[in-house]
């Protein structure tokens, strides 16, 4: 049984790609949780670009992406997540901090990739993208991984996640 976490990015606010930050890395928020053959990604900061390269190299075709919130440092790597452009892959994207007036997670990500902010629209991503909004405080399962959520005190709202698998 495998249950492991890898940090692909831990920086807040802005990526720091210089030698003085190499000890802890310079990418913004992105964590990979591996539960046997399941891949759950927390946040899509600049670290998701490297994770995408791993997904391609290891032919990982399915993942869940749980977003804590949609501040730039948590989503600005998403347009550079190459697996999202591959029609042979499936990504289930979830968020619990957006209310109906904010349009949901699909709308937030499409706005980030809309002209004039970005030259490639969300619709260019050919993977099977599923978008799901929930309410922070909900609990759900991802293929045997129990996910408990909690609302966080953060500007514009955020969601905390607790993942449990086989008693861990």
What role is predicted for each listed range?
Residues 1-168:
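Binuclear metal-dependent hydrolase catalytic cores
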């Amino acid at each position: 049984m495998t249950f492991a976490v890898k940090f692909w990015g831990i920086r807040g606010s802005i990526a720091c790609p210089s030698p003085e930050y190499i000890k802890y890395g310079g990418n913004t928020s992105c964590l990979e949780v591996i539960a046997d053959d399941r891949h759950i990604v927390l946040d899509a900061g600049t670290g998701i670009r490297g994770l995408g390269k791993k997904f391609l190299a290891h032919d990982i075709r399915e993942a869940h992406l749980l977003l804590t919130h949609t501040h730039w440092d948590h989503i600005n790597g998403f347009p550079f997540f190459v697996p999202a452009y591959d029609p042979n892959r499936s990504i289930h994207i979830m968020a619990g901090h957006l209310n109906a007036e904010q349009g949901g997670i699909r709308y937030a990500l499409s706005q980030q990739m809309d002209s004039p902010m970005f030259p490639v629209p969300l619709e260019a991503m050919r993977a099977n993208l599923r978008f799901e909004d929930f309410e922070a405080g909900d609990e759900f399962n991802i293929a045997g991984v129990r996910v408990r959520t909690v609302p966080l005190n953060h500007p514009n709202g955020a969601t905390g996640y607790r993942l449990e698998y086989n008693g861990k």
